[in-house]
Design a protein with these regions (language model features):
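Short, small-residue-biased leader/transition segments that mark boundaries at the very start
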Residues: 1-13
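Flexible gly/pro-rich beta->alpha loop and the following alpha-helix that scaffold active-site loops
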Residues: 23-46, 201, 205-212
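Conserved N-terminal alpha-helical segment that immediately precedes and caps sugar-phosphate-binding
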Residues: 11-12, 32, 57-60, 147, ...
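Short alpha-helical segments enriched in small residues
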Residues: 187-370
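Proline/glycine-rich low-complexity loops and linkers
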Residues: 12, 33-129
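Short, structured active-site "lid" loops
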Residues: 12-23, 280-288
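Glycine-rich beta-strand-to-loop/alpha-helix junction loops that act as flexible
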Residues: 23-31, 108, 183, 310-313
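Accessory alpha-helical/coil subdomains and C-terminal extensions
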Residues: 98-174, 179-181, 189-194
Length: 370
């Protein structure tokens, strides 16, 4: 945001200490976007207008029927010493500088723009540049066990990992991923040692493993539903449609997903899901009895083969001594058969919503696999 703050610690490109430096952000059209100016100063390079970038910017605004300002045109001003990396998702191009056998890369700060350029442009170029080194990665996705408990279970296995393999624990809301990375000269050998370690890992935590690499729970459930030629609906309370959002984010979900009943209030639980008021009064809306009825009646209302129901206390209000913040009940019904489980999450509303949806998909997967 300020030129002095964005300047490199050293003042000459020959002083760079790292082989690769990647910067994100500050490439936009506003006055606080000064990364481009800092790089021009650092590499002692004039700013010049790049015809391809200007064309991309003009087409970007034309497609959206938006007027083009001088500030927008200035997006095409780039340091003359930079190799331009086209941004097909926005207006700020990426920039690649070669200096004294070092590489400096500047990418837009908008996450999806940065991610796409990194994945489809930067990583392939870096692999080509450093083709002598092979990197093999495999990710094991787990559910239902925390990072520290997982680490305890795997202590001996981790201690005896092949010396060329590095392990990383990558926790997210309700999920922990184990990433194994091997580096060396022989890709076939690296694949073999990674696969051997996963074969040792599987019996230790098999009940927690649900997928690998880029698998998603919603994707696995989708494949199982399509395989069975069966349909799904959801009945949501505390998640407010977030589970439906995850399911419908997949293209083709209309082939198996019928829709969602978002019964946030008790009145709608009674009206739309036919939950007797006596059940809600007697047990509370966050209860085994109510969530199971939500799932069973959701199947009936939507005429679907399966229904996943969620009811909980996302917070920050609504908790009691009996039902503290983060209490969530989830049920999965298949016709008249239903299973349910109680979860105790934390005190952060959004995290509780995300973890509820993840846990619900995990339960659905288990039912579909039976």
């Amino acid at each position: 945001d300020h030129l002095d703050l964005h300047s490199f610690p050293t003042r000459r490109s020959s002083d760079l200490n790292h082989d690769i430096v990647i910067l994100t952000g500050g490439l936009g059209p506003t006055n606080d976007d000064v990364t481009k100016l800092s790089l021009a100063e650092f590499f002692e390079s004039d700013l010049v207008s790049d015809p391809q970038v200007l064309k991309d910017v003009e087409e970007f605004f034309l497609k959206r029927n938006l007027g083009l300002t001088e500030k927008n045109r200035n997006q095409a001003l780039v340091p003359a010493k930079a190799k331009i990396i086209r941004n097909r998702y926005g207006t700020a191009p990426g920039m690649w500088f070669d200096a004294n056998e070092k590489i400096v890369i500047a990418l837009p700060g908008v996450p999806f723009e940065m991610k796409n350029i990194l994945e489809f442009e930067i990583i392939p170029r870096l692999k080509n540049r450093f083709s002598g080194t092979c990197v093999v990665q495999k990710t094991v996705n787990t559910l239902g066990i925390g990072e520290s408990f997982l680490s305890d279970k795997l202590a001996d296995w981790e201690t005896n990992l092949h010396p060329q393999i590095r392990l990383a624990y990558l926790p997210a809301a309700g999920i922990v991923k184990l990433r194994l990375t091997a580096k060396g000269q022989n890709e076939e050998f690296l694949n073999s040692i990674v696969e051997a370690e996963i074969q040792k890992l599987d019996p230790l935590i098999s009940k927690y493993i649900w997928g690998f690499d880029n698998d998603t729970l919603e994707g696995i459930c989708a494949a199982l539903l399509l395989q069975k030629k069966q349909t799904l609906t959801t009945a949501e309370s505390c998640t407010g449609g977030y589970l439906a959002h995850k399911i419908t984010a997949l293209p083709g979900s209309s082939q198996y997903y019928k829709g969602s009943i978002i019964a946030y209030s008790n009145a709608l639980k009674t009206k739309l899901l036919n939950i007797p008021e006596s059940e809600i009064t007697g047990y509370g809306s966050v209860s085994k009895q109510v969530v199971e009825l939500m799932a069973i009646n959701g199947c009936k209302a939507m005429q679907s083969d399966y229904c996943v129901a969620i009811s909980g206390i996302a917070g920050p209000g609504g908790a009691s001594i009996e039902k503290p913040l983060g209490t969530v009940w989830i049920a999965v019904a298949h016709k008249e058969n239903v299973i349910s489980a109680k979860f105790q999450f934390g005190d952060q509303r959004h995290t509780n919503i995300v973890r509820s949806a993840v846990a619900a998909l995990g339960m659905l997967r288990e039912v579909l696999l039976k």
